[in-house]
UniProtKB/Swiss-Prot annotation:
Protein name from the UniProt record: Exportin-7-B
Native organism: Xenopus laevis
Single GO molecular function: small GTPase binding
Gene coding for it: xpo7-b
Keyword Protein transport: yes
Source taxon at top rank: Eukaryota
Length: 1087
């Protein structure tokens, strides 16, 4: 132990400094000393002394948190007796000290929960010593209110702790503990909690009694934790609860069939203080979401009836809903009425007509208060969206009344948004239109709601649009209109254009009629007429939000009415012809292109408009028939012949803008490339003509690089814009003839400029990232476009350039030294990731025979591979999996290397081989299925290589194995634990986890077993003996069947047989382990 911490008094002082001081250096010194204390051998004994004798709450907190760390560590865990003693000590300590600071009590309860969870399967004399949780807290529950609060907190924290996976322990162990806790304790805890709540609700709560309030709050938290439990291990994503079903076990049926459980929470809502009711509503949300299969039809109807009655009672007494938290939870509860029940079931509820009226009134009122709780409104719109979507399918004879109430909801949404515009402008409030994500989400919901009783929606939109458009036109004609009034009308029109786009996008082909298509035509005509008006004013003024709404409208219109699948006889086109003279799709496409060119001309410096305009162009260029119609338009030919900054300002060099703003240029040139390819064929003259602006830009850059004194910033911007343009063209050119023209254009003339830029600006990712991404595109053999003639050396020359760029960048980026964590990815790891992608694409493209490089003494392949190794070793293992793009590019490259270049892997230094094997081992348990599958493939290639080499070395005849093979075998024999660990990991995943890629996992497993027969036998015995005695024979038989008919080779036939056996094995093991209470603790080899 270091000198600074000699006594309890010193520890007390350090705790005070850590938690109270405002001086940073003092706090850091205290933190450092306390970290040393935590890691010291006497930490455990001194923690007990601190709890016994410490005079400050902070020292008690330190002791509790240190003990929690000690019991949580997976390496060198505390002995069982010691953990039992700590658990008992915590229970006694809290039982004798009810007046501790709340944060100390919470820390000790957390300690109890952690010990109990991690020791759940620990047994002593055939007794699971950590499972008697209700017995542990009974003495607290039978005492005063203060003690009862502590007892309930124990159960609440434990339920929460067991429900949460812990990154430091295997997911398999977490799920086994959670499942066992669910089956053996959770229902008893839930029942106890409900009973205590019933007792509490039966008494009149003293509003002044804080301890009673604490008890009620803890009971509600406990109940919510029980209902929120991840019963079947599927709730990994908590970011969305729209379609959440609570998978209540069948053994809990009695509690939900008893209507008093549901009634308890509705009664509590009406009887307890408002600050507790959000939790009550949260519990009701979970109860309303119980899985449908828990009930038969009659039981579900009865349950739903009680639920709807409770909702009705809240709506009839809405006073508490003025609280934002109550309001939010109640909106969630309403949404669950439709996400978990069918409209046909709802309409059969006795009070349905009254309830749907109350819900409609509540929704209308909520929407009218547009400034209030937009996140809660999401759930209301979700309810109405699902109700409206169900109308075509409902078969019940009872009226659903949605034809009455849905138009009211639509009208309320539309009119409230329009009315908000004036208030926002007048009071300088935050504009909802600034939150594009929220607006889009609401519009997606409205698109379905608005299509219900569409004639009413359309009539409303036409009336409001005509009104605003007429006022807007009059204001413009007056010439002296106040800017405020103009802004109001532009804001209203912005909302209307967004909403019109949404309801058109909500058209469903099988449910739409000619009349509805004609109504769409009415709306489209109005938007296009407005566009003509606003475009005519762009030289003087424009409104960015209105333009963005137009682009949103065009996108929806394109999806529904432009393309190969649309019936051209649509009544919409007839209406467009009558009003605007647009007779067919080609004429409508000319409107699209005209708008795109207008936007690029006037809004070239506005990134949001430019990027969305170019995305629209890109989407239009994908359709097979539409792209052929587009090419015939004079406006498109103009773009193909005049793609310069003179006509399109966003192609210019703007020193004020960010270089990342140039990304949209790639989208532009991808679209132009597709349009050019329609008629390009092998016309080199047409290609050269198209490339003239880029040729001029490259020649200009070449002159800059040749002169000693050039403007570096200007050169960078020119180059970045150019490579982004080229990447777009390269992406679009997926035919051999066009791609070969591009290749001949760029190589050898301009490739040296890219190499020179990497040398000069390797430290600037704004410059290197686009260049490396262009290289990745050029070497990508998409659609077999890189098929060089047999007499052409271009494949090898292209790889040489690739190798040169990777080597240049790799060697220089490694000179950057230590980088701050927050800049590491941007400055280094992103570039490394792209280099891995470049190398993978080049190695797997099948256009280079890599055997010739060594044959002719060409170092290009070796240089690239050695650079890969250097870059890899500069990246810590943890970073490989922490950054998804890096992990995906690394593991996909490694897959190619182990498949085609195993001799290179085998020739590496031992520490490099161990690094690669460790990365595969860690990747096997990655959450990303793509990474996990790649690791299985890598492991399979390595194991197959090992097996073949061992088989050859066992035979006397034939040539001796290469030197690198012998070295590799020697390294593997020196470190058998690495392959053995991977064998246990793969088997562990297949037996105990929800294995999503079973086929991939099966491929390396046979090789691993054949290479480690003795270890596999031990592992198998360990797994069998860890089962309860009555299950051991069945598990033994599973393993026997797994190896039934399997020979000692890795021939395809034998592998396929093993894969089939493994599928049966997994099914049999799962059946065998059902209802088993065995635990991982007796199976250390598996963890």
């Amino acid at each position: 132990m270091a000198d600074p911490v000699q006594s309890l008094a010193q520890l007390e002082i350090l705790c005070k400094q850590l938690y109270e001081t405002t001086d940073t250096s003092t706090r850091l010194q205290a933190e450092k000393a306390l970290v040393e204390f935590t890691n010291s051998p006497e930490c455990l004994s001194k923690c007990q002394l601190l709890l016994e004798r410490g005079s400050s709450s902070y020292s008690q907190l330190l002791a509790a948190t240190c003990l929690t760390k000690l019991v949580s560590r997976s390496t060198n865990p505390l002995p069982l007796e010691q953990r039992i003693d700590i658990r008992n000590y915590v229970l006694t300590y809290l039982a004798t000290r009810p007046k501790l600071a709340s944060f100390v009590t919470q820390a000790l309860i957390q300690l109890y929960a952690r010990i109990t969870k991690l020791g759940w399967f620990d047994s002593q004399k055939d007794d699971f010593v950590f499972r008697n949780v209700i017995g542990d807290v009974t003495r607290f529950l039978q005492d005063s209110v203060e003690y009862c609060v502590i007892g309930v907190s124990f159960l609440s924290q434990l339920t929460n702790e067991i429900n949460q996976a812990d990154a430091t322990h295997p997911l398999t162990k977490h799920r086994k503990i959670a499942s066992s806790f669910r089956d053996s304790a959770l229902f008893d805890i839930f029942t106890l909690s409900c009973n205590l709540l019933k007792q509490a609700s039966g008494k009149s709560l003293l509003l002044s009694d804080e301890s009673q309030h604490d008890l009620l709050m803890q009971l509600l938290k406990l109940t919510h934790n029980c209902l929120n439990f991840d019963f079947i291990g599927t709730s990994t994503d908590e970011s969305s609860d729209d379609l959440c079903t609570v998978q209540i076990p069948t053994s809990w049926r009695s509690a939900f069939l008893d209507s008093s459980t549901l009634q308890l929470f509705f009664d509590l809502y009406h009887s307890i203080p408002p600050n507790f009711t959000p939790l009550v509503l949260s519990c009701l949300v979970q109860i309303a979401s119980v899985r449908r299969s828990l009930f038969n039809n009659a039981e579900r109807a009865k349950f739903l009836s009680h639920l709807v009655d409770g909702v009705k009672r809240i709506l009839e007494n809405p006073q508490s809903l003025s609280d934002p938290n109550n309001y939010h939870e109640f909106c969630r509860l309403l949404a669950r009425l439709k996400s978990n029940y069918q409209l046909g079931e709802l309409v059969k509820v006795e009070n349905y007509p009254e309830v749907i009226r109350l819900i409609a009134n509540f929704t209308v009122t909520s929407l009218q208060h547009w400034e209030f709780a937009p996140n809660s409104v999401h759930y209301l719109l979700s309810l109405w969206q699902r109700l409206a979507a169900s109308v075509p399918y409902v078969k019940a004879t009872e009226p659903h009344l949605l034809e009455t109430y849905t138009p009211e909801v639509t009208k309320s949404y539309v009119t409230s948004r329009l009315e908000s515009v004036h208030i926002i402008l007048r009071d300088g409030l935050e504009d909802p239109l600034e939150d594009a994500g929220l607006v889009q989400q609401q519009l997606d919901q409205l698109s379905t709601i608005g299509r219900c009783e569409y004639d009413k929606t359309c009539a409303l939109l036409v009336q409001l649009f005509d009104q605003s458009a007429q006022t807007y036109q009059e204001l413009l004609q007056s010439g002296s209109a106040p800017s405020m009034e103009l802004a109001v009308q532009e804001g209203r029109l912005t909302w209307l254009v967004y909403i019109i786009g949404a309801v058109i996008g909500g058209r469903v082909s099988f449910a739409s009629t000619d009349e509805q298509d004609a109504m769409d035509g009415e709306l489209v005509c109005r938007v296009l007429q407005l566009m003509n008006l606003t475009d005519s004013r762009l030289a003087q003024a424009g409104n960015e939000k209105l333009e963005l709404s137009m682009l949103s409208f065009f996108e929806q219109f394109r999806k529904i009415y432009i393309g190969d699948q649309v019936q051209k006889s649509s009544k919409l086109y007839r209406r467009l012809s009558d009003v605007l003279g647009l007779n067919d799709e080609t004429m409508v496409l000319s409107i699209f292109i005209g708008k795109i060119i207008t936007n690029l001309k006037y809004w070239g410096r506005c990134e949001p408009i430019t990027s969305k305009t170019l995305q629209l162009l890109n989407d239009l260029s994908i359709g097979y028939s539409s792209v052929r119609k587009l090419v015939k338009l004079s406006a498109v030919q103009f773009m193909l012949n005049n793609h310069t900054s003179e006509h399109f300002s966003f192609l210019g060099i703007n020193s004020q803008s960010n270089m990342s703003d140039m990304r949209c240029r790639t989208t532009f040139y991808t679209a132009l490339g597709r349009l050019l390819m329609v008629d390009l064929g092998e016309d080199e003259e047409q290609f050269s003509q198209f490339m003239m602006p880029l040729t001029a830009a490259f020649e200009s850059l070449a002159q800059m690089f040749n002169s000693n004194n050039f403007n570096e910033q200007e050169a960078k911007r020119s180059l970045v814009g150019l490579v982004r343009d080229l990447r777009g063209i390269a992406f679009a050119f997926n035919a051999k003839s066009s791609f070969m023209m591009l290749f001949d254009w760029i190589y050898p003339a301009y490739m040296p400029i890219l190499q020179r830029a990497i040398e000069l600006w390797f430290h600037d990712p704004a410059c290197t990232t686009p260049i490396l991404k262009l290289m990745a595109e050029l070497v990508h053999n998409r659609s077999q476009r890189l098929q060089f003639d047999v007499s052409s050396p271009n494949g090898i020359l292209l790889f040489r350039e690739t190798s040169k760029m990777i080597t240049t960048y790799g060697n220089r980026i490694l000179t950057l030294g230590e980088l701050p964590k927050e800049q590491l990815y941007v400055l280094k790891l992103k570039g490394i990731s792209i280099c891995f992608s470049v190398l993978k694409a080049a190695l797997s493209g099948n256009y280079v025979n890599f055997g010739v490089f060594r044959l002719y003494g060409d170092e290009a392949l070796d240089n690239a591979l050695q650079t890969f190794v250097k870059l890899l070793l500069s990246v810590p293992h943890s970073d490989l999996l922490d950054y998804p793009k890096l992990s995906q590019s690394y593991y996909s490259l490694l897959e190619v290397l182990t498949q085609d270049h195993m001799s290179f892997i085998a020739s590496l230094e031992p520490h490099v081989i161990m690094y690669i094997l460790s990365s595969i081992s860690e990747g096997l348990t990655a959450l990303d299925t793509m990474v996990c599958t790649g690791c299985c493939s890598c492991l399979d290639h390595i194991v197959t290589y090992l097996f073949k080499q061992l088989s050859r070395s066992g035979k006397k005849r034939g040539a001796p194995p290469p030197q690198e093979s012998e070295r590799f075998l020697h390294i593997m024999q020196q470190h058998p634990e690495m392959i053995q660990q991977m064998l246990s990991t793969v088997l562990n995943i297949i037996i105990f986890e929800d294995c999503r890629n079973q086929w991939s996992m099966s491929r390396p497993l046979l090789g691993l077993i054949l290479l480690n027969e003795k270890y596999f036998s031990d592992l198998r015995s360990s797994i069998v003996s860890s089962q309860p005695p009555e299950k051991q024979q069945a598990m033994h038989l599973c393993f026997e069947n797994l190896m039934e008919g399997i020979e000692g080779n890795l021939l395809t036939k034998n592998r396929d047989r093993f894969t089939q056996n493994l599928s049966a094995f997994r099914r049999e093991v799962n059946d065998s382990m059902k209802n088993s209470s065995c635990g991982p603790n007796s199976n250390e080899m598996m963890s």
